[in-house]
């Protein structure tokens, strides 16, 4: 048996990113500064949004959004069972209560009927998750929250301005995806993105938040609120304080420390230059996979439809009729051949943290059935066409061996 060396998701870093980081290191300004501001401006151009705030993670971006919205004790936020913990843990960080809903049968998206049923007078936000870069059905989500406006009770300035449950998209996987011709970022009320090392677009660690144009929002004031929350509650960042006579500042809230550095932003600036071609390569690999698995028991989530186009972050497959044990055996056998696979994700109610909060997987049968048969294959821009063929052939062979034709 031949042993390969195909990692799951290594970063794609060129000499361009390296040189840009060196330039920043030599510039004398390495924390939040001109390159972070430039990345924010360019990301807003890319997503067709009024402003972007870059932070040190998508998790921070999501939590700060809940804070800016004034969500806290006594409030409820709805999240799907099929997501990573970050989508949910931030709700507890903010002092609110998570309401976890099941996904729809034979789907990765939340059950929108269950979403409607879960909205109460205490609901302040819903966090849809664009899993694998595949946009949720935002028309349906907005239809649901609009239909429940009569229940909504605002208790903060931005809640008043929205006048309904906020749609706060976890777009960690979805930078570059589109929904009905609109870039993700300009669809939900607020959208957070991840720039973690394994993401399509990386700053090593990092993330951002943006929002769609809203006539009730003062974009500069909203941007300033995020800045204050992200830097200890301080009214000026380090760059602003360097201006002559500008040392004076105030601390207006006991805030966080989650700003992005110019070193990280330097990576992002070059990544953004390269991003269109990186997305093209991902689409090409997805097409090769789809063709290779035709006529087998292996099915994949669809990255394109009449209403959306995914940025192709993950290639998520389901192996028809596989048991939990067989799924594990397939992943081990792939690893023995040097091909790294993953699972996205364990449903939240299967995790100890959420079991301890009273969630029971028996109440989430669709999420569990989705999870049991799921295997994620390598999908990254350092894969060669030859390696894609190797993955296809070995995966098909192992699935047939373990589960049958």
Model regions: which residues?
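PLP-dependent aminotransferase-like
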Residues: 67, 71-171, 178
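N-terminal "arm"/small-domain region of PLP-dependent enzymes with the aminotransferase-like
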Residues: 1-29, 34, 250-252, 378
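Active-site PLP attachment segment
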Residues: 173, 186-236, 262
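Conserved active-site segment immediately N-terminal to the catalytic lysine
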Residues: 155-202, 247-251, 299
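PLP-dependent aminotransferase class I/II
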Residues: 37-41, 49-50, 125-129, 134, ...
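Hydrophobic/aromatic ligand-binding patch that stacks against planar heteroaromatic rings
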Residues: 89-91, 183, 263
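Phosphate-binding glycine-rich loop
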Residues: 29-76, 90-92, 100, 149-153
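Structural detector of well-ordered beta-strand residues that form the stable sheet scaffold
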Residues: 53, 78, 99, 166-168, ...
């Amino acid at each position: 048996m031949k042993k390969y060396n195909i990692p799951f998701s290594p970063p794609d870093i060129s000499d361009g990113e390296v040189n840009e980081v060196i330039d920043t290191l030599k510039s004398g300004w390495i924390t939040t500064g001109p390159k972070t501001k430039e990345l924010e401006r360019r990301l807003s151009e890319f997503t067709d949004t009024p402003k972007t705030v870059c932070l040190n993670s998508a998790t921070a971006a999501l939590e700060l959004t809940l804070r800016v919205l004034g969500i806290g004790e006594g409030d409820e936020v709805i999240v799907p069972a099929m997501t990573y913990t970050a989508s949910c843990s931030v709700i507890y960080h903010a002092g609110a209560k998570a309401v976890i809903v099941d996904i729809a049968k034979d789907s990765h998206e939340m059950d929108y009927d269950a979403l409607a049923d879960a909205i109460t007078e205490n609901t302040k936000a819903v966090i849809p998750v664009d899993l694998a870069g595949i946009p949720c059905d935002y028309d349906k989500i907005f239809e649901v929250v609009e239909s429940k406006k009569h229940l909504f009770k605002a208790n903060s300035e931005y809640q008043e301005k929205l006048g309904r449950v906020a749609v706060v998209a976890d777009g960690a996987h979805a930078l570059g995806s589109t929904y009905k011709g609109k870039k993700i970022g300009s669809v939900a009320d607020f959208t957070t993105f991840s720039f973690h090392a394994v993401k399509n677009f990386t700053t090593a660690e990092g993330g951002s938040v943006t929002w769609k144009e809203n006539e009730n929002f003062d974009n500069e004031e909203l941007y300033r609120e995020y800045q204050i929350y992200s830097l200890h509650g301080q009214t000026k960042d380090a760059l602003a304080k360097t201006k002559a006579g500008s040392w004076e500042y105030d601390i207006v809230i006991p805030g966080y420390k989650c700003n992005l550095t110019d070193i990280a932003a330097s990576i992002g600036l070059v990544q953004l230059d390269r991003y269109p071609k990186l997305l093209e390569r991902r689409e090409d690999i997805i097409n090769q996979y789809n063709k290779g698995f035709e006529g087998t028991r292996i099915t994949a989530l669809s990255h394109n439809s009449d209403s959306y186009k995914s940025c192709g972050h993950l290639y998520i497959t389901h192996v028809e009729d596989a048991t939990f044990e067989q799924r594990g055996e397939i992943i081990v056998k792939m690893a023995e051949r040097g091909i790294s696979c993953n699972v996205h994700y364990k449903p939240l109610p299967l995790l100890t943290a959420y079991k301890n909060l009273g969630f029971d997987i028996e109440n989430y049968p669709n999420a569990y059935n989705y999870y049991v048969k799921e295997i994620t294959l390598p999908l990254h821009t350092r894969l060669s066409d030859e390696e894609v063929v190797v993955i296809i052939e070995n995966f098909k062979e192992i699935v047939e061996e373990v589960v049958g034709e």
